[in-house]
Amino acid sequence: MYSLLIDTHDENVICIIFKDGKVINKKEIKSNMRHSEITMPALIELINEEGIKISDISDIIVNIGPGSFTGVRIGVVIAKTMAYLLNKPIRSINSLEMLVYSREELKNGLYKVDEKNGYFVGSFDENGNLINEIEYYSFDDFNTQFKNKEFVNVDKLDFNNIYQNVIKKKPINPHLVNPLYVKKIEVLK
């Protein structure tokens, strides 16, 4: 069983193929704001390197953000289109869940994801469930609001652990998978 993970929420495009729940190939490419040019060729290359066909993919996982508005939309559209056209299950994960699920043992507490002008913050319980809405804080607001708060530290994403947790989620109708927008688009401010 092959699974595909697509993550385009920040400056890197990450595409991973899992076989029976373990990472067998991964592409992580610094995109320099060229997600739309890089993501599909990276996916095709990844699949070709494994000698499989696109139809061999049994399910798709996509990071829905928060993160780069354009980056997230690109990954979500590709994942939704593939899931719909190939009639494959799709599951979504948000950027903070990627951190939570990377841990060997799930840990309750505050998690944060860096963004160019601040942080996305969420609180999770010991089962990896989001307790509150993910919120965005500028660096100044963050330093004021969370001055004496401790955050759970995740040094490195563990994609095998992420897979083991996200695969437990119920698949979603591809038409219902949407980017997670937390802050307002800059141009609308």
Q: For each of these PLM feature ranges, what is it?
A:
Residues 43, 78-82, 100:
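Buried hydrophobic packing segments
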Residues 1-22, 91-189:
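Oxyanion-binding and handling regions
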Residues 1-58, 135-136:
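N-terminal beta-alpha supersecondary unit
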Residues 59-90, 95:
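DPxDG-like acidic metal-binding loop motif
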